[in-house]
Every structure is written in C-alpha cells, then in structure tokens.
Amino acid sequence: MEGGGERDHEAEPEYHCHDFEWEDLRADVEANPSFSHHLSPFPTTAASPSPSSEAWRSFHRRHASGRFFKERRYLLKEFPDLLNNNDVAKMLEVGCGNGSTVVPILRCSRNNIVYACDCSKDTLEKANEIVNNTEGLDGKDRFHPFLLDVSKETFPDWLFCKSCQMSNAKAVDLLLDSSEHNTRKEHPVLLKENQCCVGGIDAVTMRCVSVLKPGGLVLFRDYGLYDMTMLRFSPSQRVGFREYMRADGTFSYFFTLDTMRELFHAAGLLELELEYCCVRSINRKNGKSMQRVWVHGKFQKPTR
C-alpha cells in the first residue's frame, strides 16, 4: 500500500469505543436537573422549523476553502470490512461531505470503488478535488461523486446492481406507497415522539437498502444519545425529541440503539453489530475531559 508525503510519518490512528460505560453516563445525565430539558417529551403541538438542505449547502460553502474535517482514518479500525485487499468492493457513502471518509477508504485498497452523494454541489467539487490531488491515492477512476438529496430523492437507476435493480426498486416503491408505510409514518413505534432526523428516515433507510446487493453490508456511525454535543444544546435549540438546530440552521439528531434496530429491521436487514461507542477525549487547550457517544452499527442484507 503506497503512501505519500507526510503520511509516512503520521501516527497510527487509534480507535477507542469503551472508555466509559454508556449506562453510567445515562445515570449521571438523568440525575442532573440542568439536563432535564433533554429528557422531557417534545410537545406534538409545538411548531418546529423544517430542516433545509440549503443550510447544509451554506455550511459547506463556508468551509470550502480548507479541509474543515480531518481524514477519518479510525473508521478502518472500526469497520475492518473496509480493508478489502482481494476482491473489487463497491461502496456508497450517503452524505460524503468533503471526502474525509472517502480518502482513507480509497487509500487502504486499490480494489475499493466509492460512489458518493451529497446535497451540496460545492462540497462534491471539493471532495473530487481532494481525492484527485491527494498524493499516492490514485483514486481518479475509483471515486464517483453525484448530486442527490437522499431525504427527498431516490437513487438513479444506474446505481442499482443487476441483482437488485428490479426487485429492490419495486419493493421500495411499493413500501413507500403502501398503507403500511403511511400507518408507520403516522404512528411509528419508537419514532412516535420525534419522527427521527428530518422525518421520513425510514424511507431514506429503504432507499439505501434498495441499492444494496444481497449479502451486502450497511456500516453506520452517527451521534448517540447523551453525546457531549447534545448536552450543550440549550432548550431554545430543541426542535424535536432528541433533535436540535444549530445556529447555522443545520439539524442534529441523537440516535439510540433501539431506534437503529427498528429502522434496519423494518428494512429487512440482519443485525450483526450494534453498540454505543463511548470515547473520552481531552481538550488540549483547557484540559477538560469530553465524553463522546456514537452509535456503531453493522447490518447485512439477507442473501435470500
């Protein structure tokens, strides 16, 4: 595996996931009166702003001049499946940003091919620039970015493999149009209080599953309940149950294991791994300890 430039001298990335117990953090949060606004049900009659893709486009335009996000090289240790050295592996990243995930995936194996979508044209151009200009990467013909807002649009036909092009596409259309889906959207089991993220995340999940070949994997990592960033939000920033709006208009949702289990099981996937990743890090400027929480999940599409 070829490197380039200063990368030969970079420290080996570390991966931590059990620095503390999530249940201990939960007990501390729920016993702290200052966090009570995070725990109370969100009133269903409250008028909340609707999430806008334009907020993310503006975010990426503001950070287009530099590498706002560092390479997420730790993902190769969190998900060893990405370390593919034998067969050609085609991957899809939904919401690729500026390529901070794509670069280490392409670098770790010349057999990896990555398709990546985002709702921002500016950030796709930046990601393509970074991939093409990263020394020793040779990812020009292995990186295929395309513009798509997955919260509103279905994937293009050319992305579907032969084994799933007909059956999965039809299955998703039937699900999205069915009375069962309409009932779920109105009365979801675990998402009843929040409508999760931008609302309709169950439809987004099904769209992702629709382009996954039988036996393929969904690798998931996102904010987990009681992450440090969640606890910093004020009551006025709360726009839903476990959902908050930042000052720039972008939204953050904090997942639970039950939420993810329900979403992917409803989409027909098998649960292989699902846990909270609990990481304690130290702020080098002020020396304060930070407790970070992510949900780590790996799900597989059945072969039959």
Q: Each PLM stretch: what is its role?
A:
Residues 49-62, 66-70:
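S-adenosyl-L-methionine
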Residues 224-286:
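C-terminal alpha-helical "lid/dimerization" subdomain adjacent to the S-adenosyl-L-methionine
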Residues 188-190, 202-214:
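A short glycine-rich, Lys/Arg-flanked "PGG" loop and its adjoining helix->strand segment in the class I
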Residues 215-222:
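Conserved beta-strand signature within the Rossmann-like core of class I S-adenosyl-L-methionine
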